[in-house]
Structures are given as C-alpha cells and as structure tokens.
Amino acid sequence: MLPDLTTLSDFRNALAQAPGADADARAACEDRNGQLTKPPGALGQLEEIAIWYGSWRGTARPEVRAPQVIVFAGNHGVTARGVSAFPAEVTVQMVANFKAGGAAINQLAQLADARMDVHALELDRPTADFTQGPAMSEEDLLAALRTGWNAVDPASDVLVVGEMGIGNTTSAAAICHALYGGEPGDWTGRGTGVDDEGLALKTAVIAEAVALHGSRDGLEVLRCLGGREIAAMAGAIAAARVLRIPVILDGFICCAAAASLARLHDQALDHAVAGHQSAEGGHQALLARLGKAPLLSLGLRLGEGSGAALAIQVLKGALACHSGMATFAEAGVSDG
C-alpha cells in the first residue's frame, strides 16, 4: 500500500524508505538464465532486463500481464517567452485527442495490451514563468506529485509515464542544467521544432532561469523549474518504486523528471530502465548521467510515453525467452 502524502517531507521519506528488489528472485533468475538453451550472454540486453524485471516482481519466471501507461498534461508559463513553435492551446487539444484514442500513444498502448490513463493538471492555470520566479509553490508541487502518486494502479506490473505540455522541453532542459551543470546549450533541443533563432532564444531563457534559481536538491529544482506534468511523472515513478513496480522510462522529459528523484536518493531509479534514446538534444547525455542504457534508438522525439510504450514489446520478448525457453536438461541438449 502507498502511504498518503500530506507534505513534501512525506514524499522524501517514502522514497528513502522504499524497498529494494528481491535478492532471492534475482539469484533464481540468474540461475535459470544460465541453464537456458543458448550460449551465455547470447541474448544480450534481453537477458539483463529479464533478470532485472524478475527481481522486482519477485519471481524467477515473470510475465507482463497488466501494463499501465499514464499520460500527464500541463501548461507552462515560460511559453510566453516564445520558446515553442506551437501555442499553449495545443495541450488542451491533444488531451482531447488522447481521450478520443487518436494519438500515437493510444495505438502503442493498445498494441502492448496496456491500460491507458490521462490526467490533465490545471491546464487553465499554467505554471509561472520561471525566468521571473519559481514555476510552482510548494502546495502546487505537492498537488502535482500526489496526482502522479495516486495515478499508479498497485495491480499493474510495469509502468510507463508520458507527458503532453507545450514548453516542457524548455522546463526539462532547465532541470537538467540545474542538476548537472555544463552549458545550457548542452541540454537544449528543438522541442516542437523551433528554428535556429528559436533555439538560441530557448537556450538563453534556460540560462536566465537557472542563474535565477541556482542548483538545489531534486524537489526544489522540480518546484522552481518544472511543470505540473513533469512533477506528476516524478510522483508516479516514485510510487512505482515504493510498490516495486518496474518502470520503463520514456524520453528526455520523462528522464528529467526521473533525474529529480535520482538527486534525492541514489537508488531511486533502480526499478527503472530506459525505453529508448530520443532525438531531443540532451537525452543521450542525460541517460549517461542516470546510468541507463536505452532499449531502443529510433530517432523518436514525440513524447507522450511513445518510446517507452513501444519498449514494452521488447520487455515482453525478453520475458518470453527467459520464462518460456527450455533448459539444457529439459531439451536434452549438451551444454558443453
């Protein structure tokens, strides 16, 4: 069961006290993997993710039966600075598209036999322009974290979180710049497709915001530079950690949300793998900072949870091999 969150301290404490993976299940998965009818390591990363998944689900022969995809939507005050190629009303329009089943994520979630939920977070009340002050109050941050926290179905067995929010690549890049330093341009991509002039403006806005707020702990960075949908993703990822539900991370924005948790606790993302490496500037460097190797690299930069939802199929393939293959003894094959 998830504890209730009434303060930000509750969130910090729940994450710090979250249980780890099942060591006995991991050992059993490794033992089984060593007996399957293949050369050691021949299935590469598929072997690693099957063992990882089994250790979090507590069984040597795991299966995915109840995947959940959650898409969070929020609007950003920083869009007033001209950092996006699309107007903020597109967020509302895309939420309607999600609910009607017309977006890419709807098709990929359906393909994965995943439950899909959509949560719109106060779209008529954008976050504040974070070049002028914090994006959110502590109350707003807690409310967004709680939305994500409570959105996770405890009966799900793998979680994907996605987002929709015009301006949120600017927010994600600012979070990464605040957490990891470097140059603002290291973390800044074209998002919805800004031109060179727009990219230069976006980079300058990020530099201005981080100079104003500085580098703080994960929740303060999220409060000052994040969006409601980004905070909700962080809340959902943290809830899954407490519930020992494996998570497949999506692209740059999702991983920026995850990075705020990693700053809070070193083991906060042990239950997560990277579904893909997106084409958005900064994602490759962010994955390296998080120590996550992507399962896919297809040049995606859509968001919505699309790359991670597609990676559910990779996970299912890994588990089909791990749980369904015969051992050398069962098949009567010499193991050399």
Curated annotation (Swiss-Prot):
Q: From which domain of life does this come?
A: Bacteria
Kindly give the Pfam families that the UniProt entry links to this protein: DBI_PRT
A biological-process GO annotation? cobalamin biosynthetic process
Which pathway? Nucleoside biosynthesis; alpha-ribazole biosynthesis; alpha-ribazole from 5,6-dimethylbenzimidazole: step 1/2
State any single GO MF term. Answer: nicotinate-nucleotide-dimethylbenzimidazole phosphoribosyltransferase activity
Task: Quote the InterPro entries the UniProt record gives.
Answer: Nict_dMeBzImd_PRibTrfase, Nict_dMeBzImd_PRibTrfase_bact, Nict_dMeBzImd_PRibTrfase_N, Nict_dMeBzImd_PRibTrfase_sf
Q: What class of enzyme is it?
A: transferase
Which segments cross the bilayer? none
Q: Which keywords does UniProt give here?
A: Cobalamin biosynthesis, Glycosyltransferase, Transferase
Q: Recorded E.C. number(s)? A: 2.4.2.21
* Residues forming the catalytic site: 304
Kindly state which reaction or reactions the protein catalyses: 5,6-dimethylbenzimidazole + nicotinate beta-D-ribonucleotide = alpha-ribazole 5'-phosphate + nicotinate + H(+)
Q: Which family does it belong to?
A: Belongs to the CobT family.
Biological role stated in the UniProt entry? Catalyzes the synthesis of alpha-ribazole-5'-phosphate from nicotinate mononucleotide (NAMN) and 5,6-dimethylbenzimidazole (DMB).
> This protein is called what?
Nicotinate-nucleotide--dimethylbenzimidazole phosphoribosyltransferase
What is the organism field in this record?
Ruegeria sp. (strain TM1040)
